[in-house]
Amino acid sequence: MATNGNKKEYDYVVALDIGTSKVVCLIGQLTDSHAVEIVALGSYPSSGLKKGVVVNIDATTDAIQKSMDQAKNSFDGKLKNVYVGIAGNHIKSLNSHGIVGIKDKEVTPFDIDRVIEAAQAVAIPSDQKVLHVLPQEFVIDDQDSIREPLGMSGVRLESHVHLVTCANNAIQNIEKCVKRCGITLDGFVLEQLASSYSVLSEDEKELGVCIVDIGGGTTDTVSYTHLRAHETY
């Protein structure tokens, strides 16, 4: 396993922002306080995307590879796994809810999983897939605005969630480009959601805030109230 000093490979997170105007590769080191410290960055102009969607496989692959090569110039390790930010007009979202009975009259992790799964049981177009399920609040019997229901007593558990979906073909084309570069794709993250994690404070998300991510081909937003994402565009 590749190392950088005394750090193991799994102490690093690699992220790709595959944008319309450029591709950026970030390598972050996980600190003892569970924060991420950026240790390497690579950037290369992109010509293979339009409005966040791949329109040229070869050009996109080349930009990804060259951005990673730049990042590796200051990183003593091997890039094997990566998370990719995703945006574009193919991203859709909706709010949904689910209801289940609480099996043993006390909420368990299994109950939480079931009620979130129930909230996902909505019809989405066959050419779309679920990207994120973002819990907003839980309701136990008549008590609402619950953020963490684990261990609470009740009979009926409800969940309100924000669902984000993306086009299957958009995902598949990005996967193809990443795999051509010889690395494993760990997952996708909605671009504006990733941006909000890095720039918004807990107080801002509690009081209510909207972040606007202006890119070369798309402008994307996410709004928060009471610490939860309620709308994404």
Residue positions per predicted region:
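Nucleotide/phosphate-binding catalytic cleft detector across ATP-hydrolyzing
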Residues: 1-22, 26-211
